């Protein structure tokens, strides 16, 4: 009888006998993948590049055919014309939008994290019914709330006041649901029970255990919320009827109405309005990518 002995090699990822770690496997993208990603990136970036091209040229050259593909030398002049335009008041619009979007973002992330933690890890009477009620608010079209909200702003005397843009949107049903789902996936029950055994209160558990784990999701929610209310036009256009107290999107609408044939000035104003979003994305790039990747893996 013949016996054959098979000697298994070391499992993948273990240290070799010489002490060197096994090299990680690197998956290289094929040429079709590289070409596809290059085309997708070009299509995504080209509108921004085209905005810079038009904003840096004269109004006459913006209508030329074939169009110029390289930036001109009038960007500073066009930007200065936008800033000097008292009708558009774009600097005031940027300030109001930053205050409104920033306040709404901070409030949404904070309350969504707390409520998400409560719905995910705490046990209390009526929890499921309350969660369903919050989810149902997401199914109501925004347009149905316009008239009741507008009448409420009149009763409160908040028309032409930035509070009318901020207060109705301080809490988000979507944000609560997102943070609840992320808490369920990222924070084990055993970790919370261990903190309770150590004598931590519910607030300390949230602050020192749950909140650090929610940072990637908070970064994604914060960016989405800030972008949404930075780009919001319809509601501010209704409640901020005073042209001297606009948001940035209302300022761009005024600029477009007053100078509907001056594409260079309109695109220069659009470029100014886009810069804050670009800066915020660059500052929080790592947290945003981490949140998207972790959400994709855990989902």
Kindly give the residue locations of the regions a language model identified:
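A structural signal for multi-pass alpha-helical bundles of membrane permease subunits
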Residues: 24, 30-299
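Short, Lys/Arg-rich, polar N-terminal cytosolic tail immediately upstream
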Residues: 2-27
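An internal, D/E-rich "acidic patch" concept
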Residues: 1-6, 294-298
């Amino acid at each position: 009888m013949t016996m054959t002995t098979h000697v298994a090699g070391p499992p993948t990822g273990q240290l070799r006998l010489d002490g060197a770690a096994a090299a990680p496997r690197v998956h290289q993208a094929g040429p079709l993948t590289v070409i596809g990603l290059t085309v997708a990136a070009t299509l995504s970036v080209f509108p921004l590049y085209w905005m810079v091209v038009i904003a840096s040229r004269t109004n006459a050259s913006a209508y030329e055919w074939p169009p110029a593909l390289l930036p001109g030398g009038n960007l500073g002049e066009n930007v200065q014309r936008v800033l000097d335009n008292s009708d558009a008041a774009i600097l005031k619009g940027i300030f109001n939008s930053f205050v409104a979007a920033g306040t709404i973002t901070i409030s949404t992330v904070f309350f969504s994290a707390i409520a998400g933690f409560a719905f995910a890890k705490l046990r209390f009477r009526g929890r499921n019914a309350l969660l369903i009620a919050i989810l149902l608010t997401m199914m109501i079209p925004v347009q149905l709330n316009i008239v009741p909200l507008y009448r409420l702003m009149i009763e409160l005397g908040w028309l032409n006041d930035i509070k009318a843009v901020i207060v109705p949107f301080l809490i988000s049903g979507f944000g609560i649901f997102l943070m609840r789902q992320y808490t369920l996936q990222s924070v084990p029950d055993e970790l919370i029970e261990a903190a309770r055994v150590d004598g931590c209160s519910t607030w300390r558990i949230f602050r020192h255990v749950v909140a650090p784990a929610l940072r990637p999701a908070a970064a994604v929610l914060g960016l989405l919320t800030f972008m949404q209310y930075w780009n919001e036009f319809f509601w501010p256009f209704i409640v901020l009827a005073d042209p001297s107290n606009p948001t940035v999107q209302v300022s761009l609408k005024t600029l477009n109405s007053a100078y509907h044939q001056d594409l260079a000035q309109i695109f220069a104003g659009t470029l100014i309005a886009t810069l804050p979003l670009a800066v915020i994305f660059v500052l929080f790039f790592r947290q945003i990518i981490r949140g998207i990747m972790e959400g994709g893996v855990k989902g």
